[in-house]
């Protein structure tokens, strides 16, 4: 059985750790609120640009845009969005596990990684990484998404990739994050929804389509980054909450052991005193 000194040392150490996990939980909760607001705000915009793109594609008379043309698949681009840091439960592990399984289906996969965790994992295993992006910060900017989307489109148009998949974590709530795979390129023009009135395109549907297609890719990347960031904060908040609760349970168990050890020591001392007194009387 551990000594009382060891028990006190362990209790103190766990209490210090508990303070850290509690603080990290509070920080993650504050960041999650902001990230969640950005996710909610981005979804209607992504839906609207998809609707306008569908109507422009239906009205165009021009030959297919390069981002719409399907070609023989010789190399597959795989964009994986993970976190730069850990301590967020199974967030990174779930995404990496999904990517590991899906990459086996491609004969010549080439990765673009967003976040250190995914980059480090696949670099150690010898996968070809043609682009990496880290340190995007806690608040994802559209400029950052534009840079990443521009790099993806550049590699697609120059023939490095013949198709591109985007893997990210969809935010459902702080307890639930779902890894998702989205085929990003070549784009498939969304089906036009009925209703909503007629659209008049200026200067033409072709010009609008040519402008919207790259913007659509940027919006999809931006939404994926926002969803993943909110998922990361939600997973970290949940993980730190669980760690704090586990620390509370461990402190309670160790305190009980300490009290029992203290009681045993007191009982032993009393027995020795009584025994000594009895020996003197004899």
UniProtKB/Swiss-Prot annotation:
It is a peripheral membrane protein. Gene3D superfamilies: 3.40.1380.10, ATP synthase, gamma subunit, helix hairpin domain. It is found in: Cell membrane. CDD domains: F1-ATPase_gamma. GO terms for biological process: proton motive force-driven plasma membrane ATP synthesis. It comes from the Bacteria. Belongs to the ATPase gamma chain family. This is ATP synthase gamma chain. It comes from Carboxydothermus hydrogenoformans (strain ATCC BAA-161 / DSM 6008 / Z-2901). The lineage of its organism: Bacteria, Bacillati, Bacillota, Clostridia, Thermoanaerobacterales. The gene is atpG.
